[in-house]
């Protein structure tokens, strides 16, 4: 039987927003103006998101088209202060601040210090600052700079690790190596920061789910992130789809992605004294696992086992957007009802 490919009419960025809507974390903020789409880790849902940059300064990863329509730039201190004034005048005084956009940590230490000072001037409750970061943005700061930022309340960075196989990172044009990820995260933690790891099942392509899981489990076990979020890879119609059409990349099926996650959770060696908050999305097939490791490990594995058993009986499914063919009704599968796993949707546990 020929594999059925889900054909998506939305941009991949919309997929990320759909993930966020399900988790209650990506939305238009009522009290702020924001270019593009808002996306952040689920655990930052209660934080006030303050835009300090627009887009991504790197913007070359093959798997990502989240920021391709945005030209990276810094938001002026004047505009940042005006936003703080506006929110403060409306009675806002948040304690948790999330600095946006795709890599706010790319700003210089002096710029970040100035922003933190501005926030504290208008929000007396503000005491904790988090943001997205890349390994290269961490590398750009000295040990002393990292310690200084942490002393001012900068506490956690969300880092796109994606995969722990060197050739995969190189092929996908990530701006760091596996060795750099190990060393820079250690420097970050030595300065007092915690970190959250973002990774993507399926990014290594078909047939590599097991070796990807083994490498990622080793990486996460050693680096001890506070949170782990899996945004199972969604194939866009831009850079990566061209590689697929040219035969240079064979995408993993959703079944392979589920097996990769299952193997990773199985292999993770998490100390009870240093638990990991786990959240994983296979949004296009409606599978999500969530919990605290190691406490909820068996529950999460049970959810994945049920999902694997169901999808093992179905034709191959790919989370893929390859244009807008006339015979696609917008729901994928060319008019056929798509399978879901609502009965095994979520593993109970702490978020």
Regions found by a protein language model. Name each.
Residues 3, 10, 22:
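Cationic, low-complexity basic patches in intrinsically disordered or flexible, solvent-exposed regions
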Residues 27-42, 221-351:
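Auxiliary Fe-S-binding modules of radical SAM enzymes
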Residues 35-82:
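Canonical Radical SAM [4Fe-4S] cluster-binding loop centered on the CxxxCxxC motif
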Residues 66-83, 87, 91-107, 122-140, ...:
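Core AdoMet radical
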Residues 115-126, 180-196, 254-269:
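Alpha-helix-loop-beta-strand connector modules within alpha/beta enzyme cores
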Residues 145, 206-220:
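Catalytic cores of alpha/beta
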